Amino acid sequence: NNYTDGDPDSYPKAEKLLDYEAGYPFANHWLTAGANFYYMDYTDQLVLTGALNDIGEALTENVPDSYRMGIELMLGIKPCKWFQWDINATWSKNRIKNFVENIPIYDGWNLLDVVSVSHKSTRIAFSPDFLLNNRFAFTYQGFEAALQSQFVGKQYMTNAEVEALTLDKYFVSNLNLAYTFKPRKVVKEVTLGVTVYNLFNEEYENNGWASSSYDKDVNHRIDSAGYAAQAGTNVMGHVSFRF
C-alpha cells in the first residue's frame, strides 16, 4: 500500500539491520545441545503505526530505532534407539524505542483527523517474549509415534502495546502415528499414518487484527479487534509411497 496507494512524496526508506550472534553447540552419540545469544539492531524498521492512506488503508512507516534480543536454547536426548526427546526454547525482548502511534478521529464513517500519541518504549507486534517447542518420538521397527507440543506466549496485535488488543498465550499438542513397511514388488516403501491435531482440544487464537480510533470528541478511545480462532481436535489420515 505504501507504493500503490500511499503519498508519492513520502515513500518509506529501506530498513537496515545489524545482527549480532554468539552461540555454542555440543553433540555426542546420545546428546545434542546448544545455546545462541542474539541482538538484532534495526534502523528505520517498517512497522504499522496506525497511519492510513486517503481511502483508509493501513500504511507502514519507518521507526528510527528498534531491536530484538534474546537467547535460544536447544536440547536433544536419545538414550536408546527407540526414543528421542527434542526441546527448544526462546526468551526474547522485542522493542520499539520512542514509538509514535497514529490514531484516526472519526465522525461516523467520516475521517476527520489523525492524532499522534508518543510512547517511550513498546513491544513489537506479534512478537511473544517466550516460545517453547517439545517433541517426544518413539520408534519400533516400522512403527513411529510422536507427540509434538508448542507453547506461545502472550502477543500484542499492535505496536502501541494496548492490553485490550492482545492474543492470549496458548499451549497446543499434535500426535502423529505412522507405520512404514516395504512391499516386495514395484513400491519400495509405503507409509500409513494418522495425525491428531490439537490433541487436547485447546481453544485458542494464533492471529488476528486490531486497530484504535477516537470518536469526534476525542474523549472516547475505541479499541477494536478480530481473532483467528483455530480448529479444535481434528484428525487427518495420510499415505505415502516411495518408488
Predicted regions and their residues:
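Gram-negative outer-membrane beta-barrel proteins
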Residues: N1, W30-T32, D41-V47, K93-F99, ...
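Solvent-exposed loop segments that connect transmembrane elements
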Residues: N1-P8, V47-L59, K97-K120, W209-A225
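Outer-membrane beta-barrel architecture
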Residues: Y11, E21-P25, N36, N62, ...
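Membrane-embedded beta-barrel scaffold of Gram-negative outer-membrane proteins
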Residues: Y11-N62, Y67-M69, R95
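Residues that define the transmembrane beta-barrel architecture of outer-membrane proteins
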Residues: K16-Y20, A27-H29, D65-M69, P128-L132, ...
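Repeated loop/turn-to-beta-strand initiation elements of outer-membrane beta-barrel proteins
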Residues: W30-A33, W82-W85, G142-A146, R184-V190
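Gram-negative outer-membrane beta-barrel transporters
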Residues: Y39-D41, E61-N159, R242
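C-terminal beta-signal and adjacent terminal beta-strands/loops
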Residues: F151-Y156, Y179-F243
